[in-house]
Amino acid sequence: QAVVIDREVPLASASLIGCAVLTGTGAVLNRAKPRPGSSAIVIGIGGIGLNVLQGLALSQAGPIIAIDTNPAKEAAAKLFGATHFICAGPDVDTAEAVKEICPLGVDYAFECVGHPALIRQCIDLLDWGGSCVLLGVPKFGSEASFVVQSLYNDKSILGCRYGAARPHHDIPLFVDLYKAGKLKLDELVSQTFEPEQVQEALDA
């Protein structure tokens, strides 16, 4: 689909709306629809995870807990809206770290990696009535498990494709949010390449 946008928006920044921004921010605004003050975890702080964070910030959610194995991602996570950062690893009890912040669990858990074990962890960390939103894409044919009784506490598992987006509606909306200073796009661009540098870009 082709969507006309304002010429004032830099193309390098605008190009990101059509993928990571729609997928991540759209998952929050269109699929999860959290109320202000809702607690959330985001597992996997890549391009999609960062946009989930800023969608949660736009929704006035909080606490917003970012989780990743790379400690270098903490600064970006907090720039995009995380109130807390947990560096996951073999020596860290991630579930315990989350419960130190939200003792009863969280209202929303966004899995942005695509790993069955992390999907299970998201479900286990939900509070009563919480929702797990699946964004990461696991290996084809993968299966994930959960304790059936846990879902009787009004928990939900929500699949989400492309941020449940309507491009002709959502892209102009995100452009307007960007122009109003409420949506970060420029900060998502780490480097640009000319067409003849395609191999360099692939190797970067």
Q: What is each stretch, according to the model?
A:
Residues 6-91, 96:
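Mid-domain Rossmann-like dinucleotide-binding core that forms the NAD(H)/NADP(H) cofactor-binding site
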Residues 36, 57-61, 78-81, 100-106, ...:
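Short, surface-exposed connector motifs at secondary-structure boundaries
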Residues 71, 97-100, 104, 120-124, ...:
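C-terminal hydrophobic helical "lid"/dimerization subdomain
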Residues 90, 114, 194-197:
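Short loop/turn segments at beta->alpha junctions
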Residues 109-110:
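N-terminal Rossmann-like NAD(P) cofactor-binding module of classical short-chain dehydrogenase/reductase
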